[in-house]
């Protein structure tokens, strides 16, 4: 006789456009607990990968960067990278360590903050995710714990077509002005 308390919960499916992918939504955890995905190779079964092999957003999220550079995924547009080094060899250190906001514009109507967070979970720790729908324009603001995670999202998702809409992604500059005390 099976015990009722030991049944595993059925995980909610994740949708990428008209395709549905099974998986857990949330932060990855220890493999011993079995409460989250354990490796990149086990994220999707072969049937799902075969169905989504021509989906540009899925490919950008799952293919290694080298394959993207080699042209397996066709780039919609080429933009200069937001690197921290300038042409004269100088680097920028300010702003590297803190949390960074990414704005994703032109999302499909009906997209929720949970949808966005689940899609971007592979890029890094998400501190906050909000979706605003203003007059039919859906826009997400996602706060990542590191600048590197935010830059990776912009690099992979800017210009990608998702759910029939071409996404626009950029890093939001911090507009807070710091006050200096005069003595």
Swiss-Prot record:
Residues 1-36 are annotated as: Disordered. It is found in: Nucleus, Nucleolus. Residues 100-174 form the RRM domain. Pfam families: RRM_1. One of its GO terms (cellular component) is nucleolus. It comes from the Eukaryota. The keyword Nucleus applies. One of its GO terms (molecular function) is mRNA binding. This is Uncharacterized RNA-binding protein C126.11c. Its main location: nucleus. Keywords: Nucleus, RNA-binding. The keyword RNA-binding applies.
């Amino acid at each position: 006789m099976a015990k009722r308390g030991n049944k595993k919960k059925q995980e909610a499916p994740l949708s990428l456009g008209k395709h549905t992918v099974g998986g857990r939504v949330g932060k990855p955890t220890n493999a011993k607990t079995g409460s989250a995905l354990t490796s990149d190779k086990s994220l999707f079964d072969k049937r799902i990968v075969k169905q989504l092999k021509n989906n540009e957003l899925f490919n950008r999220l799952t293919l290694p960067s080298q394959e993207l550079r080699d042209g397996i995924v066709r780039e919609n547009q080429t933009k200069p990278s937001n690197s921290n080094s300038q042409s004269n060899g100088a680097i920028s250190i300010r702003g590297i360590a803190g949390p960074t906001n990414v704005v994703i514009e032109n999302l499909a109507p009906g997209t929720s903050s949970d949808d966005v967070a689940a899609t971007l979970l592979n890029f890094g720790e998400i501190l906050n995710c909000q979706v605003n729908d203003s007059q039919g324009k859906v826009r997400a603001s996602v706060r990542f714990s590191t600048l590197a995670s935010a830059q990776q999202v912009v690099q992979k998702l800017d210009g990608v077509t998702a759910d029939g809409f071409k996404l626009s992604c950029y890093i939001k500059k911090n507009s807070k002005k710091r006050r200096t005390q005069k003595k």
